[in-house]
């Protein structure tokens, strides 16, 4: 770990209510991190979570990280669209959980949006935007929007 980039947790904002911030083991959250948990949301970190530098996580429903997830700098994770959109008086863009399976590596400047599932042992390339959940484990995912560019990978 780089002591210059990993100094500790930044800002944590939790709205009044039953919102939960859960750590299931060791987590290293780098300097400049901002975590926001809505009143009925949950943000869960399993054991061996690592991030460096600026990180933005905003949970309105559920964001969950599996074991041994590694996030580079300038990562954004949101389980919603930031503003409600109505059509005919009906909310059309409800929050959707974001799930990271075990052993995921997220490259710098990446954005992970609502409804995304990052599969086990996967790599998200730098500058990617992930918007869906239909990726296979052991994949490299890259681009805007994110697409599988390689299968059968492993990383350490």
For the regions a language model picked out, list residue spans one by one.
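Single conserved hydrophobic/aromatic residue that forms the stacking wall/gate
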Residues: 2-13
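Contiguous, function-dense segments enriched for cysteine-driven chemistry
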Residues: 3-4, 25-27, 31-34, 38-39, ...
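The right-handed parallel beta-helix/beta-solenoid scaffold, focusing on the short coil/turn
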Residues: 11, 19-20, 25, 33, ...
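Extended beta-solenoid/beta-helix repeat architectures
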Residues: 29-32, 37-40, 48-51, 59, ...
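Right-handed parallel beta-helix
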Residues: 39-42, 46, 51-54, 59-66, ...
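Glycine-rich hexapeptide-repeat left-handed beta-helix
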Residues: 65-67, 73-156
């Amino acid at each position: 770990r780089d002591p210059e980039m990993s100094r500790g947790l930044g800002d944590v904002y939790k709205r009044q209510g039953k919102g939960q911030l859960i750590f299931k083991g060791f987590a290293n959250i780098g300097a400049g991190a901002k975590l926001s948990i809505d009143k009925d949301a949950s943000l869960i970190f399993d054991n061996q979570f690592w991030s460096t530098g600026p990180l933005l996580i905003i949970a309105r429903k559920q964001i969950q990280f599996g074991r041994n997830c590694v996030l580079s700098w300038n990562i954004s994770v949101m389980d919603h669209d930031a503003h409600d959109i109505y059509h005919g008086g009906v909310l059309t863009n409800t929050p959707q959980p974001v799930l990271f399976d075990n052993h995921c590596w997220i490259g710098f400047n990446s954005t992970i949006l609502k409804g995304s599932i990052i599969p086990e042992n996967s790599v998200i390339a730098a500058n990617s935007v992930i918007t869906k959940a239909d990726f296979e484990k052991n994949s490299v995912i890259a681009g805007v929007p994110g697409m599988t560019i390689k299968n059968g990978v492993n990383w350490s």
